[in-house]
Amino acid sequence: MKLGFIGAGNMAQAMIGGILAKGIVKKDEIIASAATQKTIDKVSEEFGVNVTLDNTEVAKADIVFLAVKPVYYQEVIDEIKSVVNENQIIISVAAGKSVEWVENAFGGEKKIVRIMPNTPALVGEAVTAICPNKNVSDEEKKVVSELLSSFGIAQFINENIMDAVIAVSGSSPAYVFMFIEAMADAAVAEGMPRAQAYQFAAQSVLGSETGKHPGELKDMVCSPAGTTIEAVKVLEEKGFRSSVIEAMSACADKSRNM
């Protein structure tokens, strides 16, 4: 099985790293392209995979990941669609580009899978939504799921909730990073060294995954008349929850209108 990545930025590199780490394919079975020599040199050096500046070479792979920014999708598809056939699987990694949009851009009866991973793929902890079109067989769905599970967890969804997925997982790492940064800033203001503040804040988030309901976990930390409930009280007064909800709503709206 040959895998191709058109676009070799952070997300593509995270996916390549995860797939290789699980031994799903060998290095020489992956080829990646990018717009600059600097990027493909970096990918070649770090992962030992085949690289090229020619997108049409990558488009000959059995499974082709379109990992360029949405604004370049039409241009790249126009470049490669004469090379792509009905037996290949095209995996679209872009916000705002529906399965139908990608189908129409390629034309014909292509096998299209729309996915939305997130940047925790860089540490093998991504959550990836998967939405295949009707041309993808059950066996091919299993193959795609195995690939995407190599750098985190992967779940099939209905495309009508993809905008919600983008808001709750695709973009949400940025919200968490901002939260960690704000906590670290507050710790620095209280006298903690910057590097240590980031470590404490980040580890507190990392250690919060238990499988329990978040409300239950919050209550476990909030002792009566304690310091934590005092902090929670201020967060509620300042509209912490509503800010998060409104931000995610804006994110989903942006995805719908791209």
Region spans (language model):
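NAD(P)+-binding Rossmann beta1-loop-alpha1 motif at the extreme N-terminus of oxidoreductases
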Residues: 1-46, 50-53, 125-126, 188-190
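Hydrophobic residues within alpha-helices
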Residues: 15-16, 80, 183
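Rossmann-like NAD(P)(H) cofactor-binding subdomain of soluble oxidoreductases
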Residues: 37, 45-47, 55-59, 63-130, ...
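Internal alpha-helical scaffold of NAD(P)-dependent oxidoreductase catalytic cores
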Residues: 101-111, 127-164, 177-212, 254
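A short glycine-threonine-serine/GTX helix/turn-capping micro-motif
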Residues: 165-174, 195, 218
